Amino acid sequence: MNSLFASTARGLEELLKTELEKLGAVGCQVVQGGVHFQGDTRLIYQSLMWSRLASRIILPMGECKVYSDLDLYLGVQAINWTEIFNLGATFAVHFSGLNDTIRNSQYGAMKVKDAIVDAFTRKNLPRPNVDRESPDLRINVWLNKETASIALDLSGDGLHLRGYRDRTGLAPIKETLAAAIVMRSGWQPGTPLLDPMCGSGTLLIEAAMWATDRAPGLHRGHWGFSGWAQHDETIWQEVKAEAQTRARKGLAEYSSHFYGSDSDARVIERARSNARRAGIGELITFEVKDVAQLSNPLPKGPYGTVISNPPYGERLDSEPALIALHSLLGRTMKNQFGGWNLSLFSASPDLLGSLQLRADKQFKAKNGPLDCVQKNYHIAETTADSKPATVAEDYANRLRKNLKKLEKWARQEGIECYRLYDADLPEYNVAVDRYGDWAVIQEYAPPKTVDAQKARQRLFDIIAATLSVLGIPPNKLVLKTRERQKGKNQYQKMSEKGEFLEVSEYNARLWVNLTDYLDTGLFLDHRIARRMLGEMSKGKDFLNLFSYTGSASVHAGLGGARSTTTVDMSRTYLEWAERNLRLNGLSGRAHRLIQADCLGWLREANEQFDLIFIDPPTFSNSKRMEESFDVQRDHVALMKDLKRLLRKGGTIMFSNNKRGFRMDLEGLAELGLTAQEITQKTLSPDFARNRQIHNCWLIRAA
C-alpha cells in the first residue's frame, strides 16, 4: 500500500474524501487543502484518471529537518533517487516555503536539484536533465519551519487540465471546482441542466462528463508518472481501457440534454469547441443570448436545474449592471422556471440577495484567492393567484410618487437635472438625482453601528428598485458613496473616464460628469439662485468666486452681463467652466477665467463689480491656500474684502452649506452692510424636504 495525498481547493476536502473512498481509497484523513489516503498501484492510476475534484495526486518520499542548506541537501540525497527515476527521465523541482536558513525558494529548488543530480553522479550514473516546461518527473518540496517534505507529483500538470479546453481564454473557474459546483448543485444526472451565463461551457461540460461516466483524465496526454521507475504500464492501460469503455457506454445510454447560453458569440464558439473535444458536444445546445432573453427550453417539463457562475464586480461602477442582472435572473426564474432548482456560485454573496429568493442550502469554497459561496434554491411552481415579488417596496412606492410629481414640474421649468429622492425614508438612506435619461444614486455612508452586510444588501435593493421604477438601462445608473467631506477631500477624483453629458437648465446648456468626481459639476440645490443671478445681471460686471465649474457665470452671461470674471483655485474646474461658457456662446475678453486662491486674490484685487456671487466651502485647509477658512468664523472678514470690490448700488449673493449658520448682522452693520436672507426663495420643490441644504443671502450697502 502507498501513502498518498490528494490536494484540492479549500472547502472541497470532504467532497474529495467521499470521492476517493468510492474509488477504493482507505485510511482517508481530511486536512486543510486535501486528503491523506492509502492505496495500491491500481488505485493511484484510478485516482488520477477518475478524480474530478483532486488538483494533484502526490506520493510522499520523505521528510528532513532543515537547520542549514546542508541539511536540506543531505536530507534530499538520502532518498534513493536511482530507484525512482527511469534512465534518461527529465525532472523539475517545485520548492515552496521559507525559513531562517532558506530565504529564497529558487535557492531551495537549486539545492534540491543539486542533491538529486549528485546522487546519480556518486553512483557513476548519467545525471538526469532538468526540464522546467514538460518534465517526466515533478519533485515537490514544502518547507514548513524546520521541516522539509519531499514528494513526487504523479499528476504532472494540475488535474484540472482535462485536455478539452482551449487554454487561450481566461477561465473564471477551474474544471475541478466546476465539477464540485455541479455535484453540490443538487442536480440529478438524467434531468435537464441549463447555464444562462455559460462562458466557455466548463460547468456544463463537467456535468455532461459526470453524467455520461466519462473519466476526467481520459483526454490528458501527459502524466507525472511517465519517468517513474515504479510505473506499471500494464495496470495503467487496463485502467485507461476501462475508462474508454465506460465513456462509450455512458454516452450511448444518456438521453437528457444540456443547454448553455452567453451574450458573447466568441465564447459560445469556444464552448462548442471545448464540448466537442471533451467528446460530449452532441449533448449540449449552445446559443448566443443574454439573460434578458432567457426562457425555459422545456416549458412542459420535465423539471431541471439552472446552474451558473454569474459575473461579479470589483469596481463600484459595475454594480448597478450586476444588480440588474441578478434581479432580472431572479424574476425570470420565478416567472418561467417554476418547479426547477437554481444553483449559483459567486464571489459576491450580496449580489445573490438581488435574486429575491430564499436559499435552501449553501456551501463555501475558495476560487483561487476569492472566498466564494454556492447557494441552492428551489423555485416554487407558479399559480394563478401568485403575486410578483417586489424589491424595496416602500422605497419604490415613494420614488414612484416623487417621480410623478417632479417629472411634470421639471418639464414645465425647462430643467433636466433634479433631485428625485433624498433619504425620504430613513431606512433607505440615499439621494437619487436625475440627469436627463441618467440617474445618480448617492449612498450616504451608514454609521458604524449599522451592520455593513445589511447596509450593502439594502443598497442593492435600492438599485434594483430604482432601475425598475425609472425604466432605465443599468449602464445609465451611476452609484456613489458619499461620506462627510473635509477640506481638500471635497473634490476628490474617483475615476478617469472623462465622459461628459450635456444637460439643460432653464436657458443654459451645461456639461456634467457623472462618474469621475463625487460631485457632478452642477450643484442642483443652487438652481434657483443661478436663475436669479441671470435675472440680476443685465448690463453688469459679474464676479463669481469659488466658482467650481462656472455654471453661475453662464447664467449671468446669458442674462446679459457686461462681463463675467470666474475665479477658482482648480485648473480642472476652470477648464470645465470655460467649456460651459463656450457651449453657450460666451467667450472672449468679456469672460475672464482666473486660477487663484480666491481669498488671496480677493485681498489683492482692485477691480469693481456690480454683482458678486460667492459660495465658499464651509471649511477649507488646502495646502494651496495660504490659511485655513471657516465660514462661520470668517464670513464678516470675507464681506469686508468683498465690499471693497463692490460698486455703489451693487449686490453680493452669499451662500454656504453650513447647517445652523448664523449671520453676524451686527458685524455687517459695522461694515455698513445689510443682509436679506433669501434661502426659502432659492429652494425648489425637489429640495423642499431638506431646507437646510444651503442658506442664501443678498448683501448690500446700508
Curated annotation (Swiss-Prot):
Lineage top rank: taxon: Bacteria
THUMP domain ranges (all copies): 43-154
Reactions catalysed, as given in the entry: guanosine(2445) in 23S rRNA + S-adenosyl-L-methionine = N(2)-methylguanosine(2445) in 23S rRNA + S-adenosyl-L-homocysteine + H(+); guanosine(2069) in 23S rRNA + S-adenosyl-L-methionine = N(2)-methylguanosine(2069) in 23S rRNA + S-adenosyl-L-homocysteine + H(+)
PANTHER family attached to this UniProt entry: RIBOSOMAL RNA LARGE SUBUNIT METHYLTRANSFERASE K/L, RIBOSOMAL RNA LARGE SUBUNIT METHYLTRANSFERASE K_L
Classification via PROSITE patterns: THUMP, UPF0020
Family, similarity comment: Belongs to the methyltransferase superfamily. RlmKL family.
Subcellular localization: Cytoplasm
GO molecular function: 23S rRNA (guanine(2445)-N(2))-methyltransferase activity; RNA binding; rRNA (guanine-N7-)-methyltransferase activity
Coiled coil regions in record: none
Enzyme Commission numbers on file: 2.1.1.173, 2.1.1.264
Keyword hit for rRNA processing: yes
Enzyme class: transferase
UniProt keyword annotations, A-Z: Cytoplasm, Methyltransferase, RNA-binding, rRNA processing, S-adenosyl-L-methionine, Transferase
Disulfides per UniProt: none
Principal location listed in the UniProt entry: cytoplasm
Functional summary from the UniProt entry: Specifically methylates the guanine in position 2445 (m2G2445) and the guanine in position 2069 (m7G2069) of 23S rRNA.
Any one annotated GO CC term: cytoplasm
Record-given protein name: Ribosomal RNA large subunit methyltransferase K/L
Organism: Salmonella choleraesuis (strain SC-B67)
